[in-house]
């Protein structure tokens, strides 16, 4: 198996067939809905909140609400359904989560999407939760993760998952690879390729995205959707504290298994970092959209499918040659 990551890959351009990149279609279908772009902000406390979820849903973007305010999820699903926007939430695998799924069913509040969100998703606990959701909410699109092997993808698909989330510890705020010695950090793109070859259902690439070009690379190697954390951190709309240092504004960004999220020093696999303030989330989404349209034009097509067919080269060291990203 070839081992590489985003910084080791360069996609090879084809003849451009559009007169303007604005002709390129970045839409993607996941389940019963079509979205503006194949991107989703990470379901982390400093990345997604109610107001951001509402903005994304209203404007045709996919989102996954985090699971760290359990009591707020039923009111959230109700609100999104009342506004006729998609509802997309996260669950864990503890006993109370089973009761939560049953309560959704009892109230006839089937969320459009439910993501089973644990660090090591290739486990009996995730398989049992997939089956529980499908029993009580059969119409819900279930995303299960996180995983890093073809065996895990197939097993979760066979259990009933409609999509799997690939990536163990490659994110900027994740230290799983350091704390445990395991994960896809440093070879996330190769792991995505490996898993995609076995997958029969959509894959969400999760983690390791450092540039907008990495979105196109994820699509090339099999992702239907790309989950992004650090690039969506630090915006005006983002949750988390703001601090000023030497006249420059920063916003906090922490991993989902950090002590800042957990509130305790136990099984820590995340850290807190400060991200320079980036301004408006809307501006970042516009730039991502334009860059992805450019990627499609370089691929020689009019839609995302063109990116899946391009050739690539593996660069020996890094495409950045020491330049700051």
From Swiss-Prot:
A cellular-component GO term for this protein: cytosol
Coiled coil: none
SUPFAM superfamilies in UniProt: Inosine monophosphate dehydrogenase (IMPDH)
Presence of keyword Oxidoreductase: yes
EC number: 1.7.1.7
Keyword Zinc-finger appears in the UniProt entry: no
PROSITE patterns reported for this sequence: IMP_DH_GMP_RED (PS00487)
Entry annotation: catalytic residues: 174
Family indicated by similarity: Belongs to the IMPDH/GMPR family. GuaC type 2 subfamily.
Protein name: GMP reductase
Native organism taxonomy: Bacteria, Pseudomonadati, Campylobacterota, Epsilonproteobacteria, Campylobacterales
């Amino acid at each position: 198996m070839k081992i590489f990551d985003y910084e080791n890959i360069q996609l090879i351009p084809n003849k451009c067939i559009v007169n303007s990149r604005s002709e390129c279609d970045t839409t993607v279908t996941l389940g019963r809905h079509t979205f503006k772009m194949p991107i989703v902000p990470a379901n982390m406390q400093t990345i997604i909140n109610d107001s951001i979820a509402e903005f994304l849903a209203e404007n045709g973007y996919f989102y996954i609400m985090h699971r760290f305010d359990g009591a707020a999820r039923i009111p959230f699903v109700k609100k999104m359904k009342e506004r006729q926007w998609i509802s997309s939430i996260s669950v864990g695998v503890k006993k109370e989560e089973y009761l939560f799924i049953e309560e959704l069913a009892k109230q006839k509040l089937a969320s459009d999407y439910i993501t089973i969100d644990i660090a090591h998703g290739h486990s009996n606990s995730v398989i049992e939760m997939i089956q529980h959701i499908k029993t009580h909410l059969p119409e819900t699109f279930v995303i299960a993760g996180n995983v890093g092997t073809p065996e895990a993808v197939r097993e979760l698909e066979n259990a009933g998952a409609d999509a799997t989330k690939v990536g163990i510890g490659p994110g900027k705020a994740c230290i799983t690879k350091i704390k445990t010695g395991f994960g896809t950090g440093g070879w996330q793109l190769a792991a995505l390729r490996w898993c995609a070859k076995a997958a029969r259902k959509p894959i969400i690439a999760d983690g390791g995205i450092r540039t907008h070009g990495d979105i196109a690379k994820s699509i090339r190697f099999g992702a239907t959707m790309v989950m992004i954390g650090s690039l969506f951190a630090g915006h005006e709309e983002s949750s988390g504290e703001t601090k000023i240092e030497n006249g420059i504004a920063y916003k906090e960004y922490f991993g989902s298994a950090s002590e800042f999220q957990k509130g305790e020093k136990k099984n820590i696999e995340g850290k807190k970092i400060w991200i320079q303030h980036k301004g408006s989330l809307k501006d970042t989404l516009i730039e991502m959209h334009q860059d992805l349209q450019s990627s499609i034009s370089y691929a020689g097509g009019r839609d995302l499918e063109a990116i899946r067919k391009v050739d690539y080269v593996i660069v020996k060291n890094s495409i950045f040659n020491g330049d700051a990203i």
